């Protein structure tokens, strides 16, 4: 168990000025959000505390509740660019807040009440904005910007992701990240890219990624991307790494040994682990998309087994489905109990119940690692939670389709499921980490380390200087500790 953080670190994002709640709110119809860029963190914290002391409601994170958004040293076009990005992530029918210069807030503080909004306060432009987005409003870290599941530049981002995947197959982590980050920027743009000039000044867009986009805009295809897509190496590595239990290193070794097909693997079972044999045996089902209806059925089954094994324990869906995906290739569930320590020993009991029902085709149990809290904090991305890597035997209703096709369906299908158990004190961090996306989490850890000097992983947030852990009761608390605007799961599809 991670030790509890007994006091707020001086100067931390969780300090009183940034997060305390005033005794009363005198103006219930007004909800202010202060935008940190250009204003600065310390000044924002000071103004937040001052406004709250005078009865103003100031939001810690931008949300649909905001009625007044205040910026400093910001042009009207930059403000509108920021607004467009936020509204693209907002729920349908959400009313945009007023975009205001800092002068409105200072006058309101002086008057002791919100002053009427005049034209001189507003950061607006007449007519639709033209030209590319201001680079100032495209943050460098993916965890600083909303990235919806459905965006405007799918063809461009998918091309870069193919190059990223190919780079990963060759062990080139640097090139993989370069292409992934460029693709992530495209996903976050509020409008389609139609000219290369729109990318000028945007972060993570170097010469190579720009050249790929230019070819796609001019010709509809990129020769490099098509060459990679058609190559035997890429196709074989993609095929092998889609097998349950097979990583890049194993796939590369098989390729160098001359293996090219699934039949090649079936002919040499001595090369396979038990996990890989199970993955190969059920490969057809496991390569068929898992639908949202399958996820709902699986969650019901898991919740029943968990509830019988430990009343009061909870099961939370994570992964891509929590980010809004309607289909995927595996399902992740996070299990905890509101009383710390009660979750110990739960997973084996759950697995026994599922096996007794004939619902488990394969599972591999991984015990939690008994590392010291500080050692756990130092781990960059791999967590040490107890878990089971499973292949479920999911019953199918009569007449169900297979992967959306019209052909008859067997009575069951194999589905990849991971069950992960976390103590309740670490649950918010585990939920954040297991929700993804992979790049979003990588960027969140990088931001924590480089910008805040903190260590973040699925176990906690650690201050190496103070040697203390931050407490968090929710994902929102973690974002607040890091001084970031909260992004809901649906906006983490970086």
From Swiss-Prot:
Any single biological process term in GO: double-strand break repair via nonhomologous end joining
Residue span(s) of domain BRCT: 22-122
Disordered, as annotated region: 1-24
Reactions listed under catalytic activity: DNA(n) + a 2'-deoxyribonucleoside 5'-triphosphate = DNA(n+1) + diphosphate
Residues of the site described as Responsible for the low discrimination between dNTP and rNTP: 433
Cofactors, names only: Mg(2+)
Enzyme class of the recorded protein, top EC level: transferase
Subcellular location: Nucleus
Domain of life: Eukaryota
Residues that bear Phosphoserine: 12
Annotated EC: 2.7.7.7
Molecular function GO terms recorded: DNA binding; DNA-directed DNA polymerase activity; metal ion binding
Keyword vocabulary terms for this entry: DNA damage, DNA recombination, DNA repair, DNA-directed DNA polymerase, Magnesium, Metal-binding, Nucleotidyltransferase, Nucleus, Phosphoprotein, Transferase
Any single GO CC term annotated in Swiss-Prot or TrEMBL for this entry: nucleoplasm
UniProt key word Cell membrane: no
Biological function: Gap-filling polymerase involved in repair of DNA double-strand breaks by non-homologous end joining (NHEJ). Participates in immunoglobulin (Ig) light chain gene rearrangement in V(D)J recombination.
Family statement drawn from the similarity comment of this UniProt entry: Belongs to the DNA polymerase type-X family.
Additional remarks: DPOLM has a reduced ability to distinguish dNTP and rNTP as substrates, and elongates them on DNA primer strand with a similar efficiency. It is able to polymerize nucleotides on RNA primer strands.
Name this protein carries in UniProt: DNA-directed DNA/RNA polymerase mu
Gene name for this UniProt entry: POLM
